[in-house]
Amino acid sequence: PETLNWIDTFKKNSIFWDIGANIGLYSCYAASRANCQVYAFEPSVFNLELLVKNININSLSEKIKIIPFPLCEKLSFNSFNLSNKEWGGAMSNFGTNKDHENLQDLFKYNFNYNTFGLSIDESVKLLNFPKPNYIKIDVDGIEHLILKSLHTKFLIANLS
């Protein structure tokens, strides 16, 4: 409920980056409720199917862009590790399986594949994505690496 309440405060027609979009609950809510342009970052092949379905069921394909790769600290090609193969599943990460505080394994993974990832700044600079006004990050333990990549002052100044 806290995240939905937060989305209710968004200014109309804002840019919302949903990093770790899963099946698109917050993406769809922001696109329909606040008329946001949404960039839904979701690298799990299992979650992508439901994300696409939810966007189409809600007639939001013009408002939500799907980015099927992970955000990370810097441009890299690495292993995307998943703890399960369930649709709507969680507990996955990119490039590492260690938590940032005590360097313990985050979880046991049983499925992985290699893909590329890039930083928030690189997404704006290299791919011309619009600067976000709002960012939600829910990526099971590598939030610190994604935030570490947020160097550009003009990008930070755009956030609400």
Model-derived regions: residue spans:
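Phosphate/nucleotide-binding beta-alpha loop and adjacent structural elements of enzyme active sites
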Residues: P1-S160
